[in-house]
């Protein structure tokens, strides 16, 4: 039987684009690990994606994962939009490059060993783990130390509709 793991995530950006950070909590039974990092120039969506990626990449075994996020962009992207993006060679319905493709591809790879359920939680509504992740993300955004190389590349391309 696979380990049952809960992951909670959030991203933050002080300005969009601007300094940003992510926060994640990984919980297995009574054990918890937190993750956070800050980037000098990024977007809120990139930080939401990074939170999920980092937590999933920390898992060393195939697990049953319930991942809770307040980002509809992440939840819908990974459960709905990604299928057509891949069929179209990572292009939107308008034949534009998918924004944040580097992170979508990384997230897609990170979920492969696992069975996932994606839960949406309303942000800033008192959900304890979401509030903790928000605090981790905001603190990291206030002390950015990393360069978001993918954002710099992404900034040179135009977006389009998400699907």
Swiss-Prot record:
Q: Residues that bind Mg(2+) 2, according to the entry?
A: 10, 134
Quick one: a GO biological-process term for this protein?
DNA replication, removal of RNA primer
- Where does the RNase H type-1 domain start and stop, copy by copy? 1-142
Swiss-Prot/TrEMBL keywords: Cytoplasm, Endonuclease, Hydrolase, Magnesium, Metal-binding, Nuclease
Q: Name one GO molecular function term.
A: magnesium ion binding
In which domain of life is the source organism classified? Bacteria
Where does it live in the cell?
Cytoplasm
As for what it does, the entry says:
Endonuclease that specifically degrades the RNA of RNA-DNA hybrids.
Recorded protein name is Ribonuclease H
